[in-house]
């Protein structure tokens, strides 16, 4: 990401885990997920938010302006169509910061995991209608990520293709600083054609490194266990416009990506065209990563069992680990033969480690509430620390240490910490302005530090 207000952050995560309802394969290939992959299904009896990890979070249908909160996911979902939220509502300030055309539209949905933002704006992409489509076309029964909005009213916008092979895919982004980025996407057929051209060039020039065999690069992708795959991949990200430096645009992409013949992410290059990451996959299980490497570091390798779980992590320059899976317990043994046992309770997204047997024979325990939030910890000496939580937000309201001493925490309507009262009765305080920025801190000794902001939108 380039620094600035509400910057465009292009991130990716990998998981070999496959849910029962896997999400469609995204622009980085099977197993890889990007934050922009989220989608909201709009049904008559429910709203279903599908995140980039294949999870399905269910909500009740919402009326215009109505909000709902998921305690287990710490996530708010709000439907547009209302100018204000009620006084004292956790999201009242954040809602008021939205541009009117966003918060007043009943066709938009907004999600956030913090009362300080940002909002994820869930809308729809404009598509070119077909010759047989009825006009005006009805809105689709789903919403996709179309942008972000922060608490200062700044927005980041995703531009999606309206027609062709890339219809619905993000190909452009404008961030909060007005910078414009172009995302270069390719199809499997285009990558196969490029492989054929490289092979032809290498045959005509014996000094050219030999590329992947064109015969091994099919025009269509093999099926995987990671969900439907259109074969569209991100190949490069370019900075196209920067209002601060309009004449100093880079002559190379900010990042570049290459892929295997199976559409798996193979390598990542930075703006100097230096390879910074490399990945390898199981030929029998497309998308299952078996090795990865950072530039200048040794390669980390993984072995899996028949169910697709990692059973060994091999590090040639450090500790390696073996994993044994049993009912409600996982045994981890390192290359020095030290063993740790993790005992779990709960299922699916609420599975938690409740007991750890450490290599030295000591045991620690943890307790959780019904939403999977930490409520207690017991150390190896049997000393127990308890955490009181706000039932709705999950914020810590008090901590009781093993000696019975209690520390209390207080928050404002936006879930921002305003005061901490220590066991000795001394108090520290924080104050915020209307947009939620910290303006003063008062220590336990009564000393106050004040903060001033030159820019009302900083």
Label for each model-derived stretch:
Residues 1-2, 20:
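Eukaryotic proteins' extreme N-terminal regulatory segments
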Residues 2-13:
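Predominantly extracellular/luminal regions of secreted and cell-surface proteins
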Residues 10, 30, 45-458:
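Extended charged/polar low-complexity repeat regions
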Residues 15-17:
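Acidic glycine-/aspartate-rich tracts in secreted/extracellular proteins
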Residues 20-31:
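Short, polar loop/linker segments at the starts of domains and inter-domain junctions
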Residues 32-36:
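A cross-family detector of function-defining hotspots
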């Amino acid at each position: 990401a380039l620094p600035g207000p509400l910057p465009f952050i292009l991130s990716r995560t990998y998981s070999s885990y496959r849910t029962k309802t896997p999400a469609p394969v995204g622009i980085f290939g099977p197993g890889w997920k990007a934050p922009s992959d989220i989608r909201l299904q709009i049904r008559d009896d429910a709203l279903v938010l599908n995140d980039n990890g294949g999870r399905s979070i269910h909500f009740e249908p919402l009326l215009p302006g109505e909000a709902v909160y998921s305690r287990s996911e710490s996530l708010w979902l709000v439907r547009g169509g209302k100018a204000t939220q009620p006084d004292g509502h956790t999201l009242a300030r954040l809602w008021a910061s939205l541009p009117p055309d966003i918060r007043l539209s009943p066709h938009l949905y907004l999600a956030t995991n913090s009362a300080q933002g940002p909002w994820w704006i869930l809308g729809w992409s404009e598509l070119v209608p077909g010759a047989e489509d009825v006009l005006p076309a009805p809105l689709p029964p789903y919403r996709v990520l179309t942008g972000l909005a922060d608490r200062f009213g700044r927005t980041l916008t995703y531009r999606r293709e309206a027609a062709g092979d890339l219809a619905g895919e993000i190909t452009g982004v404008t961030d909060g600083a007005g910078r414009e980025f172009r995302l270069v996407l390719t199809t499997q057929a285009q990558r196969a054609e490029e492989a054929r051209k490289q092979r032809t060039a290498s045959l005509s020039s014996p000094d050219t490194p030999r590329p992947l065999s064109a015969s091994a690069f099919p025009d269509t992708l093999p099926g995987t266990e990671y969900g439907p795959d259109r074969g569209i991949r991100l190949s490069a990200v370019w900075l196209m416009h920067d209002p601060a430096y309009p004449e100093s645009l880079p002559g190379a992409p900010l990042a570049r990506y290459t892929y295997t013949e199976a559409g798996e992410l193979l390598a990542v290059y930075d703006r100097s065209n230096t390879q910074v990451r490399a990945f390898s996959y199981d030929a029998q299980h497309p998308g299952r990563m078996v090795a990865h490497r950072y530039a200048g570091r040794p390669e980390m390798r993984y072995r899996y069992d028949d169910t697709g779980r990692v059973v060994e992590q091999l590090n040639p320059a450090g500790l390696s680990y073996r994993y044994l899976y049993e009912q409600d317990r996982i045994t981890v043994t390192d290359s020095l033969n030290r063993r740790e046992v993790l005992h779990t309770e709960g299922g699916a997204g609420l599975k938690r480690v409740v007991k750890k047997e450490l290599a030295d024979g000591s045991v620690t325990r943890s307790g959780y509430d019904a939403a999977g939030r930490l409520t207690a910890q017991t150390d190896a000496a049997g000393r127990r620390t308890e955490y009181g939580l706000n039932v709705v937000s999950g914020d810590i309201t008090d901590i009781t240490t093993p000696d019975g001493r209690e520390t209390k925490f207080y928050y404002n309507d936006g879930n921002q910490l305003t005061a901490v009262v220590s066991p000795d009765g001394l108090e520290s305080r924080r104050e915020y302005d209307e947009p939620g920025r910290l303006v003063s801190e008062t220590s336990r000794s009564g000393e106050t530090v004040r903060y001033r902001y030159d820019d009302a939108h900083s």
